Amino acid sequence: VAIGTELAEVDLWRNELGHSCYLYRIDIDPECLSDEHLSDVAIRQRADITVAKLSEMMPTSFSDWDASSVLNQKLVWRSEIEFDRPGIIEIADALREALPKDTMIFSDMTQFAYVAKEIWPMSLPGHWHHPSGFGTLGYALPGAIGGATARPNQPTMAIAGDYGFQYTLQELGTAVELKLSLPIVLWDNGKLKEIEDSMESAQIAPNAVI
């Protein structure tokens, strides 16, 4: 059951889904429902409405996961993330503690955002916006400006890397013109660190990352 997902290569990290069962697709985009994955059952509907109806139809069941099992699994995930991108989790935790729970976040393609959006428990749905899939550099600032304009007097924040921020730096003028209170977290490691790390892990000499 695929709900609101393109099943893109960046979602699967492989070219094909590789399933051997029926595929049920639920999406509001008709192109997703008729793409190369060839769903057996396609439902064009909003995810929240469909999931709510499915939940009403499902028999009552209970998970064998208890609170300690969930906590232990979270600790395993955090340790894996810390191993891949060391030194970021603690900063993300501190930032989360400092922000109001209803803060709407717009993040760019940067290692800080990659870590934060995996370990940051959100209090409200629809409050973290990230350019997943296409991976657009420069998204965070204009996205946050739009979010802050649409939600006046409510907390909004942008997270960007030092390279991605330069793509839409000029939009700071728009934020000033609109008199927005818009904090920007700039993760500055002086390079395209994620690309450098990927090259090194693939045993490729880093090139054009600074």
Model region roles, listed by residue range:
Residues 1-24, 123-153, 166-169, 201:
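Glycine-rich, anion-gripping cofactor-binding loops and their flanking helix/strand elements
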Residues 5-8, 110-112, 163, 189-190:
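Short glycine-rich anion-binding loops that position phosphate/pyrophosphate groups of nucleotides
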Residues 19-109:
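Phosphate/pyrophosphate-binding active-site segments
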Residues 35-41, 126-130, 167, 196-208:
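Short beta-alpha connecting loops at secondary-structure transitions
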Residues 39-51, 169-189:
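A short alpha/beta connector and helix-capping loop motif
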Residues 71-153:
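Active-site diphosphate/adenylate-binding microenvironment
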Residues 152-174, 187:
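DG-centered beta-turn motif at the end of beta-strands
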Residues 177-210:
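Thiamine diphosphate
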